[in-house]
Amino acid sequence: MKFFASCAKGLEYLLADELLALGASKATATISGVNVEGELRDAQRAVLWSRLASRVLWPLTEFDCPDEDALYAGVAELPWDAHLSVGHTLSVDAHVSGTAITHARYAAQRIKDAVVDTMRRQGLERPSVDVENPDLRLNLSLRKGRATISVDLGGGPLHRRGWRMAQNEAPLKENLAAAVLMRGGWPRAYADGGGLLDPMCGSGTLLIEGALMAADVAPGLQRYGSDVPSRWRGFDRESWQQLVSEARERDSVGRAALKQVIHGSDMDPHAIRAAKENAQVAGVAEAIWFGVREVGELQTPPQATGVVVCNPPYDERLAADAALYRRLGDTLQRVVPQWRASLLCGNAELAYATGLRAGKKYQLFNGAIECALIVCDPIAVPRRTPLAAPTALSEGAQMVANRLRKNLQKFKKWRAREGIECFRAYDADLPEYSAAIDVYQQADGDRRIFLHVQEYAAPATIPEADVRRRLNELLAAAREVFEVPAERVALKSRERGKGGSKYGRFEQRNEIVHVREHGALLRVNLFDYLDTGLFLDHRPLRGTMAQQSKGRRFLNLFCYTGVASVEAAVAGAASTTSVDLSATYLQWCAENLALNGLAGSKHKLMQADALAWLEAERAHFDVIFCDPPTFSNSARAEDFDIQREHVRLLRAAVARLALGGVLYFSNNFRRFKLDEEGVAEFAQCEEISPRTIDPDFERHARIHRAWRLTA
């Protein structure tokens, strides 16, 4: 059976891992939630134990729903006497998008009408509505003409743990607090004897959640007490009581063993008072020290290692202050230099203001507020401090240098033949030196070489000292082989296959380097962002499209910085149209066009959601490039999931092909599966992935997949 666990945007992969650990047979991340395969007991366990989920929804029915009559009819078909007992109350939460029914409240009312009318026809008592505490809470998801009716097994939002009696201004939801703690590695740090510190603790959410996590307390125990979360007739009460009994045993053992290693402070005495009251209700007051202190007065905890968690002020109600973030970063480097930090900041600029080097960055949403979560490990490494190269290469560095020279020799003829100036020189060829090294050669001036180094996340089993040593050796080898100084080496940290943010700033050098590919000049920014503005793996596909675009109309969907458009224009395209929702990327595209003398009415830039734009557009194009993201959750457009939406997207794109036109579709989602039958209904499709991989990416040829479609 399949069910759905919803969560805040940005927590999907973390929640999927949690649900698998809780016993689900399969958990697949999607936008704002996880599709789960498991039994009802697994769903009920998630209600009791998930620290990250917002709701757990057990589906009752799914049907096509083009209008309100179809919604009513679909709900009325269900045997509601099997779901709702006589005398019990009802409530409906509705979420609608991309449908003829535009008002969620109206949709909820139609569902209530259908349930009430069905039970009346069966001669049963009319159920009453209780919005706050219903016996049965239903959930409607109505998206693009497809309705799913589910039981909310938790009876409401799961972030409500039941201990919050008092709060300071702008409280952090408990499930988001759990994510900050998990990303910071708090469970492992506690097991290793480390401490937990929040120097701006407010009403104590992060610390209380951390204490309950350390004590192995199920989040749902205090929320439900001796009650059941739902009086849905299908709810397995016997299984629930077994789960609760097991959780109480673990609770008793965990609380008894809870160590006093948690420290919280805040400059506001009212906030500290609220934090103490909340900790008392949660039953962890003895484990947490709270005190009134300004950030700069922070004192070194007795634990040698641990995790700093913090949610500094940033929203409209609490004025953001870059100086405060700078003071926070300086204080942490002075007081707990060897600790780890997990900081939920208002945005990337505020994260940068801390002055800390973020090894990992994640994009999260605190309600409607987009935030940047940075993880620093350890705190004491400033972001702009260059790693010192040894005067002579160590044995390990010499191994890396030898492999780099071998790769350069291997690529020499290919680079000369194709005129390749930007390429991947190394990609974890030696597994213990796990990083990618990209070479960017300046196209103008003295044609200097820059290196872009992306460090992959090391397994937790490898000691941090070994990770740092190997990174130093790799950097030393790269600088020697390419004869570049440290200031021309951009170092980034990145996890393979994870959903971390690509858009957080790393440095604010604002240094633009001009490079050349397929005869086009391009602007790249190697230092300020995780991605540079040029995806090197798509080089051969861009070349193919440029050759085919001469004298023809070229369309670039999800255009990013417009490199494919620029190269098509340089090759002689009659016109180019570049579509992206981001004004920043469109500006970058415009600058790339201008750099090649191509600005003008022949080259259109469209700020729009690509799918919506396609479905409204009537013009035709000869060559179309479609390289969508895996997920997109912009506030300006509907949520996008490439696995779910690709047939609709490709259908709309193929409809814009001129006679004899060709569409190139690519994506880098490792688990993507093309719906061949769905696509075959409107296009001929051929996978061309091997032909779109150049020699420098053959080591990891699954970096992207590509298809050629014709009408």
Swiss-Prot record:
Residue span, THUMP domain: 42-153
Gene3D superfamilies referenced in this protein's UniProt entry, alphabetically: 3.30.2130.30, RNA methyltransferase domain (HRMD) like (3.30.750.80), Vaccinia Virus protein VP39 (3.40.50.150)
Any one Gene Ontology cellular component term annotated for this protein: cytoplasm
Catalytic activity: guanosine(2445) in 23S rRNA + S-adenosyl-L-methionine = N(2)-methylguanosine(2445) in 23S rRNA + S-adenosyl-L-homocysteine + H(+); guanosine(2069) in 23S rRNA + S-adenosyl-L-methionine = N(2)-methylguanosine(2069) in 23S rRNA + S-adenosyl-L-homocysteine + H(+)
Keywords: Cytoplasm, Methyltransferase, RNA-binding, rRNA processing, S-adenosyl-L-methionine, Transferase
Domain of life: Bacteria
Main location: cytoplasm
Listed PROSITE patterns: THUMP (PS51165), UPF0020 (PS01261)
The protein's role, per its UniProt record: Specifically methylates the guanine in position 2445 (m2G2445) and the guanine in position 2069 (m7G2069) of 23S rRNA.
Name the UniProt record assigns to this protein: Ribosomal RNA large subunit methyltransferase K/L
